[in-house]
Swiss-Prot record:
<comment type="function">
    <text>Produces ATP from ADP in the presence of a proton gradient across the membrane.</text>
</comment>
<dbReference type="InterPro" id="IPR036771">
    <property type="entry name" value="ATPsynth_dsu/esu_N"/>
</dbReference>
<keyword id="KW-0406">Ion transport</keyword>
<dbReference type="InterPro" id="IPR020546">
    <property type="entry name" value="ATP_synth_F1_dsu/esu_N"/>
</dbReference>
<protein>
    <recommendedName>
        <fullName>ATP synthase epsilon chain</fullName>
    </recommendedName>
</protein>
<keyword id="KW-0139">CF(1)</keyword>
<keyword id="KW-0813">Transport</keyword>
<dbReference type="Pfam" id="PF02823">
    <property type="entry name" value="ATP-synt_DE_N"/>
</dbReference>
<dbReference type="GO" id="GO:0005524">
    <property type="term" value="F:ATP binding"/>
</dbReference>
<dbReference type="GO" id="GO:0046933">
    <property type="term" value="F:proton-transporting ATP synthase activity, rotational mechanism"/>
</dbReference>
<keyword id="KW-1003">Cell membrane</keyword>
<comment type="subunit">
    <text>F-type ATPases have 2 components, CF(1) - the catalytic core - and CF(0) - the membrane proton channel. CF(1) has five subunits: alpha(3), beta(3), gamma(1), delta(1), epsilon(1). CF(0) has three main subunits: a, b and c.</text>
</comment>
<keyword id="KW-0375">Hydrogen ion transport</keyword>
<dbReference type="Pfam" id="PF00401">
    <property type="entry name" value="ATP-synt_DE"/>
</dbReference>
<dbReference type="GO" id="GO:0045259">
    <property type="term" value="C:proton-transporting ATP synthase complex"/>
</dbReference>
<dbReference type="GO" id="GO:0005886">
    <property type="term" value="C:plasma membrane"/>
</dbReference>
<dbReference type="InterPro" id="IPR001469">
    <property type="entry name" value="ATP_synth_F1_dsu/esu"/>
</dbReference>
């Protein structure tokens, strides 16, 4: 059994991460899950949420936006629409997005076509703010 997981995280635009890590945690469609070396193979969808990995005793946090997570032979492949490291998130921009989404939702009912879109924008903004709060930047 390997002592590390090889993780590749990519978006349609670029490779965000290619590291050997001790463990990784993400938010799947059925809830949060963690993977350690030696985990059984599986494939799941991801929802808007936080992805955290541990490397050398330190935790790193990213905000991710929908995608897929696959484990096979101690290799983890994460394909997501977007991913931002905690220290790359513009907190003011996330707060502004939250305000816009909240304002838009006030004028909509759940039956409106754009309700789900605005609800997702709200969720993305909240996750980005949560993850930004875990940044190691000074």
């Amino acid at each position: 059994m390997a002592e590390k997981l090889k993780v590749d995280l990519v978006t349609p635009y670029k490779k965000i991460l290619s590291e050997e890590v001790d463990e990784i945690t993400a938010t799947g469609a059925l809830g949060e899950f963690s993977v350690l070396p030696g985990h059984a193979p599986f494939l799941t969808s991801l929802k808007i949420g936080e992805l955290t990995y541990k490397k050398g005793g330190q935790f790193f946090h990213l905000a991710v936006n929908w995608g897929y997570f696959e484990v096979e032979d101690d290799k983890v492949t994460v394909l997501v629409e977007t991913a931002e490291r905690a220290d790359e998130i513009d907190l003011e921009r996330a707060k502004a997005a939250l305000g816009r989404a909240e304002a838009a939702l006030k004028g909509l009912s759940p039956e409106d076509k754009s309700y789900k879109t605005q609800e997702a924008a709200l969720e993305r903004a909240l996750i980005r703010m949560q993850v930004a709060g875990k940044s190691t930047r000074k």
